[in-house]
């Protein structure tokens, strides 16, 4: 659902169009009302709901990190409203606790899929180096807004992890997909190692 706001947020940033502003704020309100889990110690965005907004469930990398890059960061930069900074800090905390917190127990990367209570979904073992890099970029960007040393340390740790464990030191560029439990590079039937353009972009921004 976060990506539904990406284009609207970018358009509003460029034009300050009042209709785009209304769409953006209505979309943000929908996410806050139906997707945000406010339970103590379990805070975070749910991954999905039913079409009518009922039965919110599961959490994930996407539900957490993509909220930052699709709209929250830009809402704060455009308005300097402290409510958006507070949400960014809450998401930074979840990144530190849930994503980075899982890394010592993986062969590579971090857990990307969780149940509603942040329990690991070990039926999904995929970890993507572009996601690790994107998370590092987000932590660095939030550090620029509120310079807490642990945010910078987290950003450096994530980027260094990819450099040391998931980067092609011979030809350059981050590899793409791994099994986080075994550390196996996933080739998906291809005869050679897999990379992707968007992961190169994430590496540059990180």
What residue spans do the PLM features occupy?
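Glycan-recognition and catalytic cores of secretory/periplasmic carbohydrate-active enzymes
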Residues: 1-206
């Amino acid at each position: 659902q976060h990506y539904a706001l990406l284009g609207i947020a970018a358009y509003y940033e460029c034009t300050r169009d009042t209709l785009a502003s209304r769409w953006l704020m209505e979309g943000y309100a929908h996410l806050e009302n139906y997707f945000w889990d406010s339970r103590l110690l379990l805070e975070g965005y749910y991954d999905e709901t039913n079409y009518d907004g009922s039965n919110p469930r599961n959490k994930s990398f996407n539900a957490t990190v993509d909220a930052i890059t699709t709209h929250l960061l830009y809402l704060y930069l455009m308005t300097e409203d402290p409510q958006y900074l507070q949400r960014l800090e809450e998401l930074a905390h979840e990144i530190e606790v849930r994503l980075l917190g899982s890394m010592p127990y993986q062969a590579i990367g971090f857990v990307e899929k969780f149940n509603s209570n942040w329990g690991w979904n070990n039926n999904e073992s995929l970890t993507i180096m572009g996601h690790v890099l994107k998370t590092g970029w987000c932590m660095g960007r939030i550090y620029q807004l509120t310079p807490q040393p642990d945010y910078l340390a987290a950003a450096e740790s994530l980027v260094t992890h990819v450099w040391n464990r998931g980067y092609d030191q011979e030809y350059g560029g981050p590899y793409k997909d791994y099994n986080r439990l075994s550390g196996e590079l996933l080739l998906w039937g291809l005869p050679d190692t897999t990379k992707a353009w968007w992961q190169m972009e994430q590496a540059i921004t990180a």
